[in-house]
UniProtKB/Swiss-Prot annotation:
Subcellular location: Plastid, Chloroplast
The protein, known as: Uncharacterized 19.8 kDa protein in petA-petL intergenic region
Entry keyword set: Chloroplast, Plastid
Record has Chloroplast as a keyword: yes
Top-level taxon: Eukaryota
Gene Ontology CC: one annotated term: chloroplast
Main location: plastid
Lineage, broadest ranks: Eukaryota, Viridiplantae, Streptophyta, Mesostigmatophyceae, Mesostigmatales
Length: 167
């Protein structure tokens, strides 16, 4: 006997696999990828995911990066095995902050982080940067990240960044 939850999970995995293929094909037009992913989500019973995608993907800049962020959301969403959980844009940005930290831990490619920070500057307001600073400022091994971050011209966070170095 297959319970309803198992069917939903199987359907979700199929959707996620198709979605991941979609984000890997970078040559596809924006107007094709987004509606396709949302349509797949709706038809596979992932209504909340579809609504979440619609909300996240309304930011038309950096669409490939946002699609990858959305894939993280979906991956985490599916791992909960429940439909009672839904990510907000705030949760997405926290997840992405964690992704940056993981990337830093794995290969130490600071240039990658700088590049992503630059591309995602529209997401920085009061969310990503303070969160990352808070995570990193307590770890002496990561302190040099601030020296790199300070080279980027983010005037609205310069005071906050500077204050971290004042003891």
């Amino acid at each position: 006997m297959i319970c309803k939850n198992s069917i939903v999970t199987s359907s979700s995995k199929l959707f996620y696999k198709m979605f991941f293929i979609a984000i890997s094909i970078e040559i596809l037009e924006y107007n094709y990828i987004y509606p396709l992913c949302i349509e797949i989500a709706q038809h596979s019973g992932n209504i909340k995911i579809a609504l979440c995608l619609k909300e996240i993907l309304q930011k038309k800049k950096y669409n490939l990066i946002l699609l990858k962020i959305a894939s993280i959301v979906i991956s985490n969403f599916l791992s909960t095995n429940t439909y009672s959980f839904i990510y907000t844009p705030y949760d997405v940005e926290i997840l992405f902050s964690n992704l940056l930290l993981e990337k830093y831990e794995k290969d130490k490619e600071m240039s990658y982080m700088i590049d992503v920070f630059t591309k995602l500057s529209h997401l920085k307001q009061n969310i990503i940067y303070p969160y990352l600073f808070n995570q990193l400022k307590h770890d002496c091994n990561k302190k040099h990240i601030f020296l790199l971050l300070k080279k980027i011209d983010y005037t609205d966070i310069s005071t906050f960044t500077h204050s971290i170095f004042i003891k």
